[in-house]
Design a protein with these regions (language model features):
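Vicinal oxygen chelate
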Residues: 2, 30-33, 58, 65-76, ...
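Short, solvent-exposed loop/turn segments at the edges of secondary structure
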Residues: 52, 78-80
Length: 143
């Protein structure tokens, strides 16, 4: 069966974002390569060679990948989707939601809904939209 993994684009903040996600999600950053370190170094303007060409964060066997934009076109940000993380406990979901929200914008606080033990939405400080969910069938801790 095929797996769907996300690939994000940033405007010069990829390294900081991926290190942040590594800490928040307790993953393992497997690759963080700049354009300057790659065979494509001469294809990129010198001032953009320190940008990230490819980053890969392992999240328990799944991948969150990213790079920095190097196009001369204006960067329009991350739009039109949200990344969804599903947890088995409300406590873990709350920890992640709180850490992701630091410096970001909460769109919907993490709370019980008619479809979930907990659900919340936010945009983190790097502009990435997130949905944090705990399925109703998961045993909410403390209840």
């Amino acid at each position: 069966m095929a797996h769907l993994d996300a690939y994000l684009f940033f405007d010069g903040t990829c390294a900081d974002a991926m290190r942040f996600y590594e800490r928040v999600f307790r993953g393992r950053l497997e690759m963080l390569q700049t354009y300057g370190e790659s065979p494509a170094a001469t294809d990129v303007s010198p001032e953009k060679r320190d940008r990230i060409m490819h980053a890969r964060l392992d999240l328990d066997g799944r991948a969150l990948m990213a790079s920095d934009a190097v196009s001369e076109d204006p960067f329009e940000g991350i739009r039109g989707f949200a990344l969804s993380m599903n947890y088995e406990s409300v406590e873990e979901a709350q920890r992640v939601f709180t850490e992701l929200g630091d410096g970001g914008t909460v769109q919907m606080p993490l709370q019980k809904t008619f479809w979930a033990a907990a659900f919340g939405m936010l945009v983190d400080k790097f502009g990435t939209p997130w949905m944090i969910n705990v399925n109703e069938s998961a045993a909410p801790a403390g209840t």
